[in-house]
């Protein structure tokens, strides 16, 4: 299927996917010749109906799954944020959880403390450093997961429907904060969503149908297209 819409030439992509194919062991095809590019320093969203392959694509990018064919190129250290943050918050307190991701770097205690405080300040949760994880709201848990990626100096963020379990106010607070983080810190992000109001915060979007990118570009245009489909 050919891709419609304006395909802007991206000189420096941070995420490149070329002709990616993936099927489950039983033979169900999920992605077929899927290709996309996310420019460095931009915030893009990935849209599509349930079963279109959005979450599978993110897991392939994060090397949680392996494709049958195709190429993936990611420029920079990668951070992944799950739909349910309880899947990745493993330590009892906020500060300890952010620090846990730094173990492999063999930093000094002072360096770890500096990284943790910098990351929590970036998501406006520095005052919760000693707070138990169980005492956090859903939105705060997602921000802690993002802080973990910032502490590890990740340059590319993959976020799999991070607002799916949040109320509308917390949803928009989170997407607005991620937008600011990306711009202020020069990050690149690909955010899976099915909520059209989140498109107001991104630089561009991809529409995935049956495992293929069928449209890409201006989020306002894509939002209008999807609203027309829903109203039909």
Which residues does each PLM region occupy?
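A short, flexible loop at the N-terminus of ABC-type nucleotide-binding domains that lies
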Residues: 2-17, 21-33, 109
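The feature captures the beta-strand-to-loop junction immediately N-terminal to the Walker
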Residues: 47-49
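Helix-to-loop junction immediately C-terminal to a conserved catalytic motif
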Residues: 62
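Conserved ABC ATPase "signature" region
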Residues: 110-128
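Conserved ABC ATPase signature
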Residues: 132-136, 140
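Catalytic Walker B motif of ABC-type/P-loop ATPase nucleotide-binding domains
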Residues: 157-161
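Conserved beta-strand-loop-alpha-helix hinge in the C-terminal portion
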Residues: 212-232
